[in-house]
Amino acid sequence: MARIAGINIPDQKHTVIALTAIYGIGKTRSQAICVAAGIAENVKISELSEEQIEKLRDEVAKYVVEGDLRREVTLSIKRLMDLGTYRGLRHRRGLPVRGQRTKTNARTRKGPRKPIKK
């Protein structure tokens, strides 16, 4: 298994799909990385040479991925909560942030129903 950005990349998958195992890299960004590294998208990771894998590592290093990206997202949410913005309040209360209805639905965000105590 090749190791890129601290993640074990699956060997038996095509390069484009395998790179999406890294948090912060989707299919579009994965295609851009393959083009920049000069690697065909339909080649499996196990078929790549060590220098091609090194090129992929260099290209991935240009982006904010994995732990840094997770930290950045967490800090931006924390910043919204500290500022007291509407979005921050919604995050703090565990409610939908982007304007969805909450009278019905929103169960994923609100969690399971809590019985009314009498």
Swiss-Prot record:
It comes from Yersinia enterocolitica serotype O:8 / biotype 1B (strain NCTC 13174 / 8081). The keyword Lipoprotein does not apply. The keyword Lipid metabolism does not apply. Belongs to the universal ribosomal protein uS13 family. The lineage of its organism: Bacteria, Pseudomonadati, Pseudomonadota, Gammaproteobacteria, Enterobacterales. GO terms for molecular function: rRNA binding; structural constituent of ribosome; tRNA binding. PANTHER family: 30S RIBOSOMAL PROTEIN S13/40S RIBOSOMAL PROTEIN S18, SMALL RIBOSOMAL SUBUNIT PROTEIN US13M. Coiled coil: none annotated. This is Small ribosomal subunit protein uS13. InterPro entries: Rbsml_uS13_C, Ribosomal_uS13, Ribosomal_uS13-like_H2TH, Ribosomal_uS13_bac-type, Ribosomal_uS13_CS. SUPFAM superfamilies: S13-like H2TH domain.
